[in-house]
C-alpha cells in the first residue's frame, strides 16, 4: 500500500464521518 491510497482512504473516512455528523445534527439526534 502506497501513501496515496492510504491518504485517499483516510480522506473518504473523514468525509463520510463529517457528512454523517451533519445529517445527524440536522435530524436532531
Curated annotation (Swiss-Prot):
GO terms for cellular component: chloroplast thylakoid membrane; cytochrome b6f complex. One of its GO terms (molecular function) is electron transporter, transferring electrons within cytochrome b6/f complex of photosystem II activity. The chain crosses the membrane at residues 3-23. One of its GO terms (biological process) is cytochrome complex assembly. InterPro entries: Cytochr_b6-f_cplx_su8_sf (IPR036143), Cytochrome_b6-f_cplx_su8 (IPR005497). The keyword Membrane applies. It is a single-pass membrane protein. It is found in: Plastid, Chloroplast thylakoid membrane. The keyword Plastid applies. Its main location: plastid. Keywords: Chloroplast, Electron transport, Membrane, Photosynthesis, Plastid, Thylakoid, Transmembrane, Transmembrane helix, Transport. Belongs to the PetN family. The 4 large subunits of the cytochrome b6-f complex are cytochrome b6, subunit IV (17 kDa polypeptide, PetD), cytochrome f and the Rieske protein, while the 4 small subunits are PetG, PetL, PetM and PetN. The complex functions as a dimer. Component of the cytochrome b6-f complex, which mediates electron transfer between photosystem II (PSII) and photosystem I (PSI), cyclic electron flow around PSI, and state transitions. This is Cytochrome b6-f complex subunit 8.
